[in-house]
Each structure stands twice: as structure tokens, then as C-alpha cells.
Amino acid sequence: MTASLGYTDQWSIDQDRKKIVGASLVLWGLWYDEGRWFAKWCPRSRVIQRIALDLLRHDLKPHLSRRCKHLKGHGGVKGTVRYLRRVVDRYRYVARFDVMAYYESVDHALLRGLLDRAGIDADLQRIVADYLALPDRPNTGKGMVAGGSLSPLLGGLYLTPLDQSMGKDTRMVYVRYMDDFVILARTRWHLKKAIRQIYRITADLKLRLHR
């Protein structure tokens, strides 16, 4: 692999991989605030998560869509707004969606499957598994903590099946910011087709939409 976002050379990547060999996370506590769960990790676990985040950003970069704008280096809120303002007048039909209780609905098995398909190694997989499972004390097999270092990246990955499907149709504009996404279409037919795809894919991911 070549060096990527967050790294300047291959040696640094290799050194970070060595640091997490056999690593696991330790959860110190959970609290609930404004409808979301937050986690407190031990200091060593926070260090491991920072390293894992850099490695996951590097390893997942080829698999994450540029249409997912909340990810580092993808434009952010300001870039998304500027882009939409630039193109919106060319399209007659607009639809906006967001996912109900997105973090709470992320299915662990489906997310691990996406990591598998991206070729993520066993050490990173184990850290992600701890990150998902340890706060899941009812053992529901779903949900991510809010405010966690890995959650934005994993949340970006989870909806890549939607990004990939919507990105195939060059007659529409599709952009996403975490679990909020916008579609611009020139015809009602294209918009309806896109909406059907969105509902099908989000249902496959065990998600429900606000509309």
C-alpha cells in the first residue's frame, strides 16, 4: 500500500500496524444524553482508537465515495453547500432524506461485512468489533456510540452501498452528509426511480427514513 491521507510514508503506516497487533478496547462507562449513547474508554483504548482511525482512513479511502461529504478531505458542510448552490438551477426536481436514529440503527454484522469486502485486516476488525460490541450491553447487534472517534468514519462506510448505486446515474446529482442526502433530477421519472432505489437499499441496510 502507498501512503495516504494522514500519513507521509509507508514506514509510519507499518509502525502503526505493529502498535495495534493483538490490541483490544476497554470500556469504562456509558451515559445517555439527548437521545444518544456516549462511551468513556480507558486512556490506552483512546490511543488505540486514534491509531485505528488513521489506518482505517488509509485503508478505506479507495472504498469511500467522494459523494459522502462529511468525511475528512471530502468538502465538509461548506463545500457541499457551495456545490449544491452551483448546480441546483440546472435541475427541476429535488428530494432530501435523512435516516431515523442512524447511529442507533447501524447493524454490526452488515458493517463488518463491508469491512471484510474492503479487505480490512484482522487487528483493525477486532478493534471495530470491540468498539461496536462493548457499548451494546443489551446485545442487540446494532448501534454505535455518539461522539466516538470511529463513528463518523464507520457511519460514512455503512451507507456506501447507497453512494455506489446512486453515483451510477449521471443524469442526477446525489450528495450525502453522514445520514442526510440530497437528490437533484431533471425529470420526475428520474426522481421517482431514485427514490425507489433509496428505499430499497436503506431497507436492505435495516434503516428507516424520515421524508
Tell me the role of every PLM-derived stretch.
Residues 1-16:
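Non-catalytic, polymerase-adjacent accessory regions of viral genome-replication enzymes
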Residues 31-66, 135:
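Glycine/proline-rich, flexible active-site/cofactor-binding loop segments
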Residues 6-8, 49-55, 137-141, 186:
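Short low-complexity stretches enriched in small and charged residues
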Residues 13-34, 88, 122-136:
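Reverse-transcriptase-like RNA-dependent polymerase core
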Residues 21, 25, 50-53, 57, ...:
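N-proximal short alpha-helices
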Residues 14, 53-59, 142-146:
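A broad, low-specificity signal for short, low-complexity segments enriched in glycine/proline
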Residues 66-67, 72, 81, 85-211:
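Conserved polymerase palm-domain catalytic core
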Residues 76:
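Soluble or luminal CAZymes and related metallo-dependent hydrolases
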